[in-house]
A protein has these predicted regions:
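Short, solvent-exposed loop/turn segments enriched in Ser/Thr/Gly
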Residues: 47-48, 57-65, 135
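Proline/serine/threonine-rich low-complexity linkers at boundaries of modular beta-sandwich domains
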Residues: 32-41
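Sec-dependent N-terminal signal peptides
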Residues: 5-15
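The feature marks short-to-medium sequence segments in extracytoplasmic or secretory-pathway proteins
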Residues: 69-112
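Short, solvent-exposed, Trp/other aromatic-anchored flexible loops in extracytoplasmic proteins
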Residues: 100-136
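N-terminal secretory signal peptides that target proteins for export/translocation
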Residues: 1-2
Length: 164
């Protein structure tokens, strides 16, 4: 009986923890702390910016592309990743291995050449659950003057299934 009660209590607490997540919508002022004091010199663009999913078999796909560009000079990327917005704040989802930048965006040794766009054409979100939310991709680099700079952009993934 004690084991069953403990099990039910744990199950209840587990369900409550998921129910308490509030996804919400970030304001333009909501920026992760690590980016707040850095100059923005890397352009980041998502297409489409509002991303509706399609369902293929038992998975949902939010298909989009992400592009990065430096207009002021060459940039050495030293960190990149993604945040998710929930509970009224940006939460780090993942910082990626720098080799992933070369593989996915086509840079060489994480160097962005001035005026050269780099595009990850299959930067897709895939999940077995259908839910929307906000993500922010960020890039931190060192510019030609040795300054640490950044770029970031949000993307809204919706729960508006296209192929119902």
């Amino acid at each position: 009986m004690k084991t069953k009660t403990t099990y039910l209590l744990l199950l209840f607490l587990f369900q409550i923890s998921f129910a308490q997540v509030e996804y919400g919508t970030p304001s333009n002022k909501d920026i992760p702390e690590k980016l707040q004091n850095l100059d923005i010199e890397i352009e980041v663009k998502h297409f489409p910016k509002e991303n509706d999913p399609i369902k293929i078999k038992d998975k949902y796909y939010w298909k989009h592309a992400t592009a990065i560009l430096s207009k002021k000079g060459d940039v050495k990327i030293i960190e990149f990743g993604a945040y998710l917005f929930y509970n009224n704040t940006w939460n780090l989802r993942k910082s990626y291995n720098l080799k992933d930048l070369d593989n996915n965006f086509g840079t060489k040794k994480q160097i962005m050449l001035q005026g050269e766009p780099y595009v990850w054409s299959k930067n897709w979100r895939i999940d077995n659950r259908l839910f929307g939310g906000w993500a922010m991709w960020y890039f931190i680099g060192i510019n030609h003057n040795g300054d640490t700079i950044c770029g970031y952009e949000t993307i809204n993934t919706t729960s508006n299934l296209l192929n119902k």
